[in-house]
Amino acid sequence: MNAAEIKALLQAHGLTPNRALGQNFLVDEAAAAAIAEASGAAEFPVLEIGPGLGALTEELLRRSSQVVAVEIDAAMVSILKERFPSAKNLLLQHEDFLDTDLGALAPLLGTQCAVAANLPYYVTTPICMKLLTSELPIARMALMLQKEAAERFTTLPGSRQYGPLTVLAQRYYEVKTLMTLPPARYYPQPDVDSVVLTLCRRPGVPVLPALPRILAAAFSMRRKTLLNNLRSTGLSKESAEALLEQCAISPAARAEALPPEAFARLAAQWEKISI
């Protein structure tokens, strides 16, 4: 969909973009096609988050055997039903993705699936954390994010953006920048550039159930040492010291200085400890 089509569609339904929901609709048809292709839609069933007016949905439906689209805005759901009335490979879910039971969607998404999303800035972190800690068999993701949010995925240890999201993304996925989209590629135009990231699951990397808990503790007080912060997991000071020593990590280290593999060692070792 181009800008003229999107404006006409909104006008026909007496709608304006909902700023409270961070609605900025993609108006670049070539970009929508490239994002759909990069998401892995041709290979896997797709979970789409925030389909909006369906610019990306249209491209996903052309490629994927199954698209499960979760949309919070009832007006958008109605328009999507009008636009794709005979799409047998589309399942629309009218709800807040943060409230969605991903376990209930799993049977629809098969043994491997893809994710495609145009994420508003204000919910980027909770949505991405939900994806990165879910049990869905996600093989690939294509995410449209504001530039500042995208930097959290690609940043290095030592930066202020480095945090739990960074570690989880880089531990389990190969993260690449697909393209940068200037404000003119959206309606209405946002204030900053957007970035499309692709995340490809790293083969053979085991899931560490304790990793989210370790990260939450480690980054809970960024100015405190790991020794101090890890005690919030229930470890005594002596046990926390022993854990860090076993993982060859200084007790004086701070979370923002550790690479993802160090947190993986911590989580794997922590799981062996009886608290």
Features from the language model and the residues they span:
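Catalytic cores of RNA-modifying enzymes
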Residues: 1-217, 245, 256, 265-268, ...
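Active-site-proximal catalytic alpha-helix in oxidoreductases
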Residues: 220-223
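Short helix-coil junctions and helix-kink-helix linkers
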Residues: 231-233
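Short helix/strand-capping connector loops at secondary-structure junctions
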Residues: 242-251
